[in-house]
Amino acid sequence: SQKVYDKAKENLDAFISRNILFRESKPCYYIYQLIMNGKSQTGLVCGSSVDDYENDLIKKHEFTRPEKEQDRINHIKTTGAQTGNVFLAYKNVDAIDTLINDWKKERSPVYDFIADDGIQHSIWAVNDAKTIGRITELFKTLVPVTYIADGHHRAASAAKVRAALGGENSPEGADYFLTTLFPSNQLH
């Protein structure tokens, strides 16, 4: 309902004004690790391309319902943000695994907390231009496709919002949507 979307916008605006959510000063990736019941999963948080979604480089395996897509579209339009994370899976690549694991070993997380549900969440910012370039190149050359594990409606809605905003001539942020990429060896 519009009331729910308005509350989401109010909450997002409050997080931004309190500097809980902020725009990084330069591009970065985030390494995200969650630990639940002694099992760890680590993925890479980034913006994935709407073009990749539309060109089937992000593989879908379920149909979406128009009313659920419209709900997500209304949320994006009201908040002015794509806040729903889409979880993508890919066939693991040793070089990417090593790079991510080395980054985690050599640095402290920028966020590390245990939520009320007992799940530990840790986040590392990858903000070194050379490392960002290496990660980007490894994905471009060694990960030809990803698969939607969760978030079919969120991904479809991101593509529809971009189309409504002018397609390839849309505002800069509309070309990407929030994703976390998990290698197959991290899926439990």
Name the predicted role of every residue range.
Residues 1-188:
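A cross-family signal for N-terminal binding/gating loops and helix N-caps
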